[in-house]
């Protein structure tokens, strides 16, 4: 059996119009980073922000107008590496920042996971940065992505395989 597709100019125009009507800045940004590999910034701050995003969004609403999204878009962001590296008790500070932004769900677990994960990053001298930067290479395989995601899943407290994949996707690496 052979199937012959005939696509007219009007078909193409209908699809183009549909896509243009449903454009979304979030989706456009993801396409720019994850497909075209542009505007990807991998550093300690982006890792910490993405880690926190994954911890916050595990079981909470996180649409574009949610408290989580508003918090994560703050500029300057209140939980940069420069700030938290000078804080005596990271867990308490993260809890305080989250509470001041009305992010009270799992208010004990999330700061504890964040502090533990930061300690892991520090103890390993941020080896994770090298591992995830390797995903910026041109010829990355799905197997390499899976190895890095599995490493994140096993290393970060409060993470599972879904959070590990979301983490890499949010950074623009998958």
Regions found by a protein language model. Give the residues of each.
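Alpha-helical ds-nucleic-acid-binding substructure associated with the helix-hairpin-helix region
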Residues: 77-157
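C-terminal extensions
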Residues: 2-12, 129-136, 146, 172-174
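Phosphate-backbone recognition surface of nucleic-acid-processing proteins
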Residues: 155-157, 166-174
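Structure-specific DNA junction-binding interface
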Residues: 1-112
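Short acidic/histidine-centered micro-motifs embedded in hydrophobic/aromatic stretches
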Residues: 70-74, 117, 170
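Short helix-capping/linker segments at secondary-structure and domain boundaries
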Residues: 58-68, 121-129, 173
């Amino acid at each position: 059996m052979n199937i012959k597709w005939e696509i007219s100019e009007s078909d193409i125009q209908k699809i183009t119009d549909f896509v243009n009507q449903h454009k979304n800045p979030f989706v456009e940004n993801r396409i720019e980073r994850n497909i075209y590999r542009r505007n990807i910034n991998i550093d300690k701050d982006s890792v910490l922000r993405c880690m926190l995003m994954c911890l916050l969004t595990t079981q909470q609403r996180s649409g574009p107008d949610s408290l989580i999204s508003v918090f994560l878009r703050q500029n300057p962001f209140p939980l940069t590496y420069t700030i938290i590296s000078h804080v005596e008790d990271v867990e308490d500070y993260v809890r305080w920042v989250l509470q001041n932004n009305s992010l009270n769900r799992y208010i004990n677990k999330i700061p504890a996971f964040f502090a533990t994960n930061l300690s892991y990053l520090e103890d390993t001298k941020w080896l994770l940065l090298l591992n995830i930067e390797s995903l910026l290479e041109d010829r990355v395989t799905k197997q390499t992505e899976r190895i890095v995601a599995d490493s994140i899943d096993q290393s970060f407290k409060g993470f599972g395989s879904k959070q590990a994949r979301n983490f890499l996707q949010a950074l623009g690496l998958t």
